[in-house]
Amino acid sequence: MNVYIDKQNLVSYVHSMKDSRFEDCNSMLKKCCDINFTFTKYDLDQLDQEDDRFSKEALVQIKLWMSTMMQGCKGKVRWGINFPPRPLKTNMHNNFSHEDLSAVYLLDDEKVITVKNMGSIIVDGPGGELSALSQLIINDDNLYTKMFNPRELESWDILDAYISPATDIIIVDRFLALDESLYESNLYALVEKLAIKSKCKLNYIIFSDDKDRASRVAIAPDWDNIRSKIKRKVKNITGYDPNVTFILKYKVEHDRTVFTNYKLFHSGDTCNYFNSKGELITKGRYLNIDSIASKDCRKSCSSFIEDMQAVINDVIRINSDLIKGDKKSCFLKFEQPVQL
């Protein structure tokens, strides 16, 4: 996972060593991240001469931290990385790669707070480094994964502490739309909950089904109505109409998965956890939440995107009418693949 750090942010980060969050964040940087400094080593050496706010003692502290980080650092450390482009733009994520969309940005830019408040990517300015990094630490015991027993859940509110900024929310659950009476308590409640950190135009891509494969009964959900309701409910949270796309009758994915830029959710049962009265009905035994900071999670996310892209390509080839909606995503493409 890439972390981009401006010079002023490095100074601020090292200065926060006494914060209780620092140890875990520092461990994550050392063990899980590729660190990309947007300035050169020479720039760092000149810090105390260029800016009278910084003493030689502060520079010594930074270099001591740097020396400690280099010992056993598992990721790459790069200097003079000219990314992201400056000045920052609120729509800069539109041109990001998949890796860029799941990176952390610690930047000294006049628009950094504006971009942060949009909730599309994890970004913060000087003084906000630990707040940004700690969003990827989700458990005191095992820093990057959390397991719940769904049978003990009271509501979807349990997810509040684990929602991160996002551009895309990809939901895979073939049973999610089979029972209209469960939409409010599950489908709609879930898409709303996943949007709580965002004030931007989100992309929802939902892989589901319009047939109960066990009984082989077609139920014909009103996809246009479902899409309209999702748009309305999410707009009430984010202020923007989301893009909503459904992909139907997929064959290769049985797991119930929710993918976002920084978190991966796995459910052992369909996400229809509650009945129309909000009472728990799931028979699932686990709901796992994994942070992109974990190398294993990053591999799973990469495989997931590849698999879902293959599903889309197959549906386009066989019957493109089974893809309904806006067909917009930062992670998935909806064009006919080029045959070589």
Where are these regions (language model features)?
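A structural/positional concept
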Residues: 133-187
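PLD/PLD-like phosphodiesterase catalytic module centered on the HKD motif
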Residues: 1-148, 188-340
